[in-house]
């Protein structure tokens, strides 16, 4: 029915629902690729590494960090502008301005911890190229806003139980991953309410 489609549309585009999707997909980490001619946003599935943060630990947000490979087991962190915001992830709030002071060299698959950060970098199957890849942590509300952009739910046919969900994003992998996880979160929520 139209009410069911309206209800699903509201749920799928709500901040609460999309915040769950963002947390599940770790979409609060933005990645960029900088080549010789341009700098572009890329999704984690298109990056040569993924960053995982400990969401129970204070983190410094809004600092761009370049990760360059050193060898198969370690990498370099390079930061041009250390000034960011100390961020409480669980409360989605900024505590104060702070500088990010990461070690110059770190190892893949190991927690890297300091007073204002706790993160891990894992290698993916995507090889490093001549491009520079960087990441930055953003606040949940910014990541949730990006997840809800260009998202639509419509009645796909006259059959009331079929809906069409679409999402445009920076990359196809981002759109597919966010859509799949959005539907999965919806299914889990529907099942838990029964």
PLM features per residue range, with description:
Residues 1-158, 184:
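Extracytoplasmic
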Residues 156-173:
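Structural beta->alpha junctions
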Residues 162, 183-194:
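A short, surface-exposed, charged and often Trp/Pro-enriched helix-loop connector in the C-terminal portion
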Residues 176-177:
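Solvent-exposed, non-transmembrane alpha-helical starts
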């Amino acid at each position: 029915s139209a009410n069911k489609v309206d209800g699903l549309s509201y749920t799928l585009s709500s901040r609460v629902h999309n915040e769950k999707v963002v947390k599940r997909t770790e979409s609060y980490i933005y990645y960029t690729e900088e080549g010789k001619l341009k700098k572009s946003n890329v999704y984690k599935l298109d990056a040569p590494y993924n960053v995982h943060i400990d969401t129970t630990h204070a983190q410094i947000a809004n600092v761009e960090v370049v990760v360059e490979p050193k060898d198969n087991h370690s990498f370099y962190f390079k930061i041009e502008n250390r000034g960011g915001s100390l961020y409480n992830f669980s409360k989605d709030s900024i505590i104060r301005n702070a500088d990010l002071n990461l070690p110059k060299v770190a190892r893949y698959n190991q927690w890297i911890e300091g007073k204002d950060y706790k993160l891990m970098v894992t290698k993916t199957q995507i090889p490093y190229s001549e491009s520079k890849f960087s990441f930055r942590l953003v606040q949940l509300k910014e990541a949730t806003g990006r997840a809800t952009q260009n998202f639509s739910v419509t009645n796909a046919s006259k059959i009331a139980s079929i809906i069409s969900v679409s999402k445009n994003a920076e990359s196809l992998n981002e759109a597919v991953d966010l859509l799949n996880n959005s539907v999965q979160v919806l299914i889990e929520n529907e099942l838990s309410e029964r």
